[in-house]
C-alpha cells in the first residue's frame, strides 16, 4: 500500500487495501523482521548544494542553456523545453521491533528539448542531467545530446514495404 498523503480520510482506505493485499499472499515461508541493534552498512546522505545559489543564478543558467542550444545549428529553431528542478527526499525504514533507519538525499534535474526544422519536417530531441552539485550540471553534454537527437531525425523517411536482406 502506498500513499503520498497520510491523513484521517485516507487511513481507513489504506487499511482496507492492506487487508486485501494480505489475503493475496500465498507464500508459506516464515517472515523475518530485523530488529534494532543489528549492524547495517552505512549509506551516506547526499545533500545537494542548490540552496547555495539564488533564483537569479538558476534562471541565468537556464537562459544560457537555451541560448547555447539555439546556437548549435540554424536548424534548431526553438527550444520547446528547458527545465530545472530541485528534489529533496528522505527514505525511512521502521518496524515494530525498533528498526529505524533513514537516508536523505537531494539533487537537481536539468532537461533541454530543442526543436529542429528543415523544410516542412520537424523533430524534437531531449537530454538531461541529474546532479547533486549545481556547478557540475553537464550543460555542454545535454546540449550536444539533445541537438544531435533532434537533428538526426531530420531527413528521415519511411522505408517502402518489401523484403530486405539482413546481415548479422
Can you say where each PLM-predicted feature lies in the sequence?
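Active-site bordering "gate/hinge" segments
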Residues: 1-168
Amino acid at each position: 500500500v502506498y500513499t503520498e498523503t497520510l491523513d484521517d480520510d485516507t487511513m481507513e482506505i489504506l487499511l482496507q487495501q492492506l487487508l486485501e493485499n494480505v489475503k493475496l499472499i500465498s507464500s508459506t515461508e516464515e517472515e523475518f523482521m530485523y530488529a534494532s541493534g543489528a549492524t547495517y552498512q552505512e549509506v551516506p546522505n547526499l545533500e545537494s548544494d542548490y540552496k547555495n545559489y539564488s533564483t537569479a543564478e538558476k534562471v541565468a543558467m537556464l537562459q544560457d542553456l537555451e541560448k547555447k542550444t539555439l546556437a548549435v545549428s540554424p536548424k534548431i529553431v526553438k527550444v520547446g523545453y528547458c527545465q530545472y528542478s530541485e528534489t529533496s527526499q528522505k527514505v525511512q525504514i521502521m518496524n515494530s521491533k525498533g528498526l529505524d533507519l533513514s537516508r536523505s538525499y537531494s539533487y537537481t534535474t536539468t532537461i533541454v528539448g530543442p526543436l529542429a526544422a528543415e523544410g516542412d519536417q520537424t523533430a524534437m530531441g531531449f537530454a538531461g542531467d541529474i546532479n547533486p552539485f549545481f556547478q557540475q550540471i553537464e550543460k555542454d553534454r545535454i546540449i550536444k545530446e539533445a541537438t544531435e537527437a533532434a537533428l538526426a531525425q531530420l531527413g528521415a523517411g519511411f522505408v517502402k514495404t518489401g523484403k530486405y536482406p539482413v546481415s548479422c
